[in-house]
């Protein structure tokens, strides 16, 4: 295992000063892309994801449409300037293709695709800045963009990450912890339905640490959910004030 440039955990605090069970600052804005049907920007600390939703609209080519449900397509992409690493090819990387599939599968349980037969919903996600936990920030952004577009949903899907750092379970991995930690677990969670839609494991986890991590993930997701709800409410209260003058 590579040695980190600074201690990841010291005197009970992480390298960025957080406690093990503490999220970075969460910032959420809804309706940020004017030419999309729905959009959201989500930041977990320095990690920032923007999602834009287009649809529902007619499926083209038509032979790909389904008679009893809609089709959701998700594209995850990291902007060339999102990391310090040089990106030489504009084509999607294998990692981006894999994460796009993972995010689609994590969103589908929340979206009532049966309401949109023979239609498609396109979700585009761009990572503007990457400092760990990009797929879970993307999941939250995409879910909010779908809600902003008025897509029928069973619940919001909130993404958080948990990991193992020096044997300690921590919430919301930053880039340093992502690169040098002993394990990570991205999670997608629907707080109202209390249902997981994404659960991936990397590293060696004992049963006890895994269960501890699940509990911490739920705690983090419920916190992000409150911030997300407030962002949605603020947008539509502002619209109501513009329309009704109150």
Swiss-Prot record:
The keyword Hydrolase applies. Pfam families: RNase_PH (PF01138), RNase_PH_C (PF03725). GO terms for cellular component: cytoplasmic exosome (RNase complex). It is an enzyme of class 3 (hydrolase). GO terms for molecular function: 3'-5'-RNA exonuclease activity; RNA binding. InterPro entries: ExoRNase_PH_dom1, ExoRNase_PH_dom2, ExoRNase_PH_dom2_sf, PNPase/RNase_PH_dom_sf, Ribosomal_Su5_D2-typ_SF, RNase_PH, Rrp41. One of its GO terms (biological process) is gene expression. NCBIfam families: ECX1 (TIGR02065). Catalytic component of the exosome, which is a complex involved in RNA degradation. Has 3'->5' exoribonuclease activity. Can also synthesize heteromeric RNA-tails. Component of the archaeal exosome complex. Forms a hexameric ring-like arrangement composed of 3 Rrp41-Rrp42 heterodimers. The hexameric ring associates with a trimer of Rrp4 and/or Csl4 subunits. This is Exosome complex component Rrp41.
């Amino acid at each position: 295992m590579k040695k980190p440039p600074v201690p990841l955990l010291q005197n009970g605090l992480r390298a960025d000063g957080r406690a093990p069970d503490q999220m970075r600052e969460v910032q959420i804005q809804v309706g940020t892309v004017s030419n999309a049907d729905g959009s959201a920007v989500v930041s977990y600390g320095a990690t920032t994801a923007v999602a834009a939703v287009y649809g529902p609209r007619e499926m083209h080519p038509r032979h790909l449409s389904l008679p009893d449900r809609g089709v959701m397509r998700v594209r995850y992409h990291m902007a060339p300037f999102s990391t310090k690493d040089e990106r030489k090819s504009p084509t999607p990387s294998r990692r981006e293709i894999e994460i796009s599939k993972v995010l689609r599968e994590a969103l589908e349980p929340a979206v009532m695709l049966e309401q949109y037969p023979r239609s498609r919903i396109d979700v585009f996600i761009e990572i503007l800045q990457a400092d760990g936990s990009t797929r879970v920030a993307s999941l939250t952004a995409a879910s909010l963009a779908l809600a902003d577009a008025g897509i029928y949903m069973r619940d919001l899907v909130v993404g958080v990450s948990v990991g193992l750092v020096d044997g300690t379970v921590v919430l919301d991995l930053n880039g340093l912890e992502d690169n040098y930690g002993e394990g990570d677990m991205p999670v997608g969670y629907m707080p109202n339905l209390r249902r997981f839609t994404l659960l991936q494991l990397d590293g060696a986890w004992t049963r006890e640490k895994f269960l501890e991590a699940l509990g911490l993930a739920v705690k983090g997701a419920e916190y992000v959910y409150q911030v997300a709800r407030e962002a949605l409410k603020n947008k539509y209260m502002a619209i109501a004030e513009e329309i009704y003058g109150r």
